[in-house]
Curated annotation (Swiss-Prot):
GO cellular component: large ribosomal subunit
Organism of this sequence: Caulobacter vibrioides (strain NA1000 / CB15N) (Caulobacter crescentus)
Protein name: Large ribosomal subunit protein uL2
Keywords: Ribonucleoprotein, Ribosomal protein, RNA-binding, rRNA-binding
Lineage, top ranks: Bacteria, Pseudomonadati, Pseudomonadota, Alphaproteobacteria, Caulobacterales
Pfam families named among the record's database cross-references: Ribosomal_L2, Ribosomal_L2_C
GO molecular function (one): transferase activity
Subunit structure of this chain's protein: Part of the 50S ribosomal subunit. Forms a bridge to the 30S subunit in the 70S ribosome.
Length: 279
């Protein structure tokens, strides 16, 4: 979908660039496939801030998206919809065998009336899903499982995709957008194509209020705070913080590695950090 640019008829319109969603469904979502969503305000289970600068925003219903794609058969795309809970669009599909409805992530170039297939072996068409062991090498894929039957975890955001580059000894090798090359079991499911809404990154909301509608609060710099609030806070007059950049908890930020799961290091053939250095 294209971008919509607005004339500067008011300060809030100046510079405004939004996604043109005129081709999406304009009604309410499928009632059986939504449930209520309680806002957390960025707080965790103990009531403390877990993610800063979150809170408020418009009410949402959570769409129950099928990330597993384990139901075999042919389904017809009923319509494409906006989903406030993610950057990608979603597609309402209807299985031809029993009429069951489901939401899936909408890939690029998928439209109402198209057919999507979930099977052991499928054609390389956007929206079709199958295990990695049967997809041709070089296929562009998204919604990739890390563990069989757990549901897709990789490449689910707007415009995201990965590429299947090889297979060896029961594992598939996939190259991610970050440059990382990693192995996953070839029994894991993946969906053909790249995720919809690639222009999401080119939006300009134009004013702070639109960010607030999305539940984002102002992002305050540490050097603008008091010492009690942040390690960079305080000082007479404007300061640069006086130390290497850290988080509010005092841990290094700006590029410090945070990965701690050494058990899965063996599945990463080439780190995304090495990929960047090699360019």
């Amino acid at each position: 979908m294209a971008l919509k640019q607005f004339n500067p008829t008011s300060p809030g319109q100046r510079g405004l660039v939004l996604i043109d969603r005129s081709e999406l469904h304009k009604g309410r979502p499928e009632k059986k496939l939504v449930e209520g969503l309680t806002k957390s305000g960025g707080r965790g289970g103990n009531g403390r801030i877990a993610v800063r600068f979150r809170g408020g925003g418009a009410k949402r219903l959570y769409r129950l998206v099928d990330f597993k794609r384990r139901k075999q058969g042919v389904a017809t795309v009923v319509r494409l919809e906006y989903d406030p809970n993610r950057t990608a669009f979603i597609a309402l599909i209807k299985y031809q065998a029993d009429g069951e409805l489901a939401y899936i992530l909408a890939p690029q170039r998928l439209k109402a009336g198209d057919e999507v297939v979930t099977a052991e072996k499928v054609d390389v068409k956007p929206g079709n899903a199958s295990p990695l062991r049967t997809l041709p090498i070089g296929t562009i894929i998204h919604n990739i499982e890390l563990k069989p039957a757990k549901g897709g975890q990789i490449a689910r955001s707007a415009g995201a995709y990965a590429q299947l580059v090889g297979r060896d000894a029961g594992y598939a090798q996939i190259r991610l957008n970050s440059g990382e090359l990693r192995m996953v079991l070839d029994t894991c499911m993946a969906t053909v194509g790249a995720v919809s809404n690639p222009d999401h990154m080119n939006q300009n909301l134009g004013k702070a209020g639109r960010s607030r509608h999305m539940g984002r609060r102002p992002h305050v710099r540490g050097v603008a705070m008091n010492p009690v609030d942040h390690p960079h806070g305080g000082g007479e007059g404007r300061t640069s913080g006086g130390r290497h950049p850290v988080t509010p908890a005092g841990k290094p930020t700006k590029g410090a590695k945070t990965r701690v799961n050494k058990a899965t290091d063996k599945f990463i053939i080439r780190s995304r950090h090495k990929a960047k250095k090699g360019r």
